[in-house]
């Protein structure tokens, strides 16, 4: 497997791995040049608004040249947003692929070495005899590729219903919704006496009281698993318990075969298998839904690239945030989603299903830019605000995301004020910035950015919102579902297998001899489990701290600090301080006297800004 990824030959093999001053490259690039002969010039050393540029003519000509050479091409990896094409677009894609390969090389080699060591150790200990033996996968292993280790509690508490339910409010919060008391119907029924015993009330009362929540993966029923692998298409009902004030699971419906509905009152192995089947669906969702966290900022940046000078302060920040961004789709197509590639080797549903899914979400109206703003998204699903039910007592994702976005927003507000003048609060400065307005028009026009702020952009608060959201997606939202999260949280086995290896049961009580060992038939064997962890470990980026590429470093690029003046430098200093405070709190998390952290029996740190890259890493 190692040789397959390292031996891939990309067109970008000889492209210089330095930041591309695209405007200058466009001005000098020969129309007949290849991807290996891109002219690379230094980044701008002074950022300025177009009306303040003493050489507006040359500036406008350079933008026109970029528009000739950087074009919107067909979507790849599913039918979502445009992917760059044209001579300059192809060169930038090739450059980013090379940057990605350089960044990933050490992580890849380390994960492969540690995989071999882990497999040898598991084999020497006799392999997996019970579900508890999956701890052999992790104990003492992956210390270099995953230096933070997997989440505390994720193995010791993997049978906990509270752990299972609270994953919806942390590791994968993007699929959960509260069922509105009047606008939403009950998705399926649960036996009344079971509901009464679990909740001390009725399903209808939970619904009416705004205490019922749904995760719906029934759409996965349309996909056919690979030979020898199996998948349900689970729906899960969760409820906010009025007695304990905890968020708990109520029922899981498989939607395939006999279409069984499981509850916590079933045999403990049947119920644990139901949670495993659900998490298998959930892992597919998180890994492929997150593709939209690539394509949305990509198309926003593409529109900016064709309309803003590289000397524009906003372009400088966007270029920084979109470091190596255009590598992910070609790399994914070459080694992850290719037939027989890493996806097919590890997941139950085939790569063709994985590629189809984000396009299906997009075709059904997903992928809206403003709809993805944190507060707006969570309110639309009834998870914050009290319009449709009682407040969630613990919402770790929202708690951490709110703080990180607050730090990003403070930076962006200071950046926008220093760029356009803070003293008089003159939002007319935005209207006079014709490049900025061209970007907004381009995004709403040829780029077809869904749900982008309308042109013209009149208020600087709107610009702050846009820039904050791009930085949040590239350095926050993406990493909740990808990057290091799967190997540390959402992909930890035995609770989160990428594939199931036995048929979905048609009757209850089919899970063996009453011990957890009976569940091994559905789970990956020793080699398959090591391969899953190895793949997910390769998604992690353990070296970003040493390379000064963390979220804390997002705005500290030397050219940005040198070219934007003291206001920018002061904003960056505060951002570093704010994110340092957040990081220290996260790093110090542990369990309270009840064995809980943020109301969960596992420690969640997926948004740590001192650990995560500031960019779309994988």
Curated annotation (Swiss-Prot):
It catalyses: (9Z,12Z)-octadecadienoate + O2 = (11S)-hydroperoxy-(9Z,12Z)-octadecadienoate; (9Z,12Z)-octadecadienoate + O2 = (13R)-hydroperoxy-(9Z,11E)-octadecadienoate; (9Z,12Z,15Z)-octadecatrienoate + O2 = (11S)-hydroperoxy-(9Z,12Z,15Z)-octadecatrienoate; (9Z,12Z,15Z)-octadecatrienoate + O2 = (13R)-hydroperoxy-(9Z,11E,15Z)-octadecatrienoate. Its cofactor is Mn(2+). It is found in: Secreted. N- and O-glycosylated. Gene3D superfamilies: 3.10.450.60, Lipoxygenase-1, Domain 5. Optimum pH is 7. Active from pH 5 to pH 11. This is Manganese lipoxygenase. The lineage of its organism: Eukaryota, Fungi, Dikarya, Ascomycota, Pezizomycotina.
